[in-house]
Amino acid sequence: MKNQTISRIFQRVLSLRIRWKLLIIAVAAFLVFLIFKGPPPGQNHFVYLADAFLHGNLGVSGGGMGLAEIVPFNGSYFVVYPPMPAVLLLPFVALFGTGFDQGLMSILLSCLCVSATWLMLKKIGANRSKALWLAALFGFGTCFWFISSVGSSWYIEHVVAVLFLTLAIIFALAKKSPLLIGVLLGFAFLSRLPVILSFPFFLLLIYEQNSTWKPRFKQATYFLVGLGILVGVYELYNFGRWGSFSDLGYSLIPGIQQDPYFTNGIFSLNYIPRHIYAILFQGPILLSDFPYFEPNWMGLGLLFTTPAFIYIFKGPWSRLSKYAALAVVCILPILITHGTVGLTQFGYRFSLDFTPFLLILTAKGMRENLGWEEKALIILSLLVNLWGVVSIIQFNFVSF
């Protein structure tokens, strides 16, 4: 495989016309995100972590400044979450200090996610209209809209992971640089650990895109090396914090052993029923007076949040669809055995770890020229999420 610089790879993937379309989509998405943006989040761990990195430290100063889930260890205070959002915040914190609004970073990255989603849909063969409708579905018809608008630390992790996962899928579909694809998936992993379990999707694409075993093995090796480098970086990061390569630090969160959501440990098969309920059946809270129903901080079922996802099940089941479904199946077990379902949230935010693959399945299930049924469900999805964003952020109509 010829050595390719990243700039050349991007130039080959993106024509000038495509770049302009991506810019227009990003600007339009940014304006919508900005209009509905929430106040600066109080839980802005990654701003302080970026500040720590800039000062040559892994631990944050000031005893954690009242941030949740800060881990005191050997006289220092550590952010337990993977560090990629803090890495992206470095230039902003360097310029503006710890007063920088992490929520602003969230919507800046979110508009890039919408553009990247449009490009991913084009790569799987969607026409211009269909790609735009489904990019809008992703940005504003899933729980991505709410988490983007809030931008707290638990939410911005999803934004960063979605961005890099979608970019990895784009380059995999374009048959470009498996080393870079591995690095991009590694960046997503450094924001949300479960997304690494989607790696079979990329290996299967490499297998399909090459007709003999020698290039298959070579490109798979490049991919795994790229991914492995970032896994190694995370292990070194863990060693720098806890003195252990494999300790993720979550068991060190003060009080987690006594938390009623974790009575069987951080992960347990006993937690599966609560996730199944959250994914399939969780509804809004019904009230006897205005506004008569309101979002539940426990979440909202996936098909209630995004009715258009019903097309996931329609098929046809091409090889790409099967690979995408496999990615979902690989990621899901670690999510549904976790003690919490992702609260507080609108929708089921853990689904964002595999939403790019759900969009592939949805696109394949819809007609190439969208009919009124598909458009109606997309519009309904947009309205549901508009209700969630406005109810919670603007009016605080939400409870358990």
Regions found by a protein language model. Give the residues of each.
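Membrane-proximal envelope and lipid/glycan-remodeling enzymes
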Residues: 1-400
